[in-house]
């Protein structure tokens, strides 16, 4: 039997060993519950096992799948960056790489003066929400009562 570890390090993130493997993997930024379950199935692991029982070989296998999921058999629609803007490849970015890619995408939209980029610049909602009553900032101005 493998020794139980309370903290397991996968892809540079500390995972809770007491949680089920699929829920523990969601602590990695860019990995949701469905993607985590797919990674477990492709790696040949039970998604319901406790993450603390992972061996070093199993951790390496999970990290390999997270680096290039499409080549390991995870479908193209499941990755978070299909047809990447710069490379044209299907990528799945996690942790700091995901943050950096999102920041670069917003900077590109601002640079080309796209509508979405301008909305980001102004700090306004980007996805078409109404702004009359929501997204207000600053002090609220009360209404004073009329003197008699």
Swiss-Prot record:
Q: Name one GO cellular component term.
A: cytosol
Q: Taxonomically, which superkingdom?
A: Archaea
One GO term under biological process is: translation
Keyword rRNA-binding in record: yes
Q: Which SUPFAM superfamilies match?
A: S13-like H2TH domain
Entry's Gene Ontology molecular function annotations: rRNA binding; structural constituent of ribosome
Keywords from the UniProt entry: Ribonucleoprotein, Ribosomal protein, RNA-binding, rRNA-binding
Residue stretches in coiled coil:
none
NCBIfam families, per database record: PRK04053.1, uS13_arch
Query: What quaternary arrangement does the UniProt entry report?
Result: Part of the 30S ribosomal subunit. Forms a loose heterodimer with protein S19. Forms two bridges to the 50S subunit in the 70S ribosome.
What does this gene product do?
A: Located at the top of the head of the 30S subunit, it contacts several helices of the 16S rRNA. In the 70S ribosome it contacts the 23S rRNA (bridge B1a) and protein L5 of the 50S subunit (bridge B1b), connecting the 2 subunits; these bridges are implicated in subunit movement.
* Family in the record: Belongs to the universal ribosomal protein uS13 family.
The name under which this protein is listed is Small ribosomal subunit protein uS13
Q: What organism does the record attribute this protein to? A: Pyrococcus horikoshii (strain ATCC 700860 / DSM 12428 / JCM 9974 / NBRC 100139 / OT-3)
Q: Tell me the organism's taxonomic lineage.
A: Archaea, Methanobacteriati, Methanobacteriota, Thermococci, Thermococcales
Gene it is expressed from: rps13
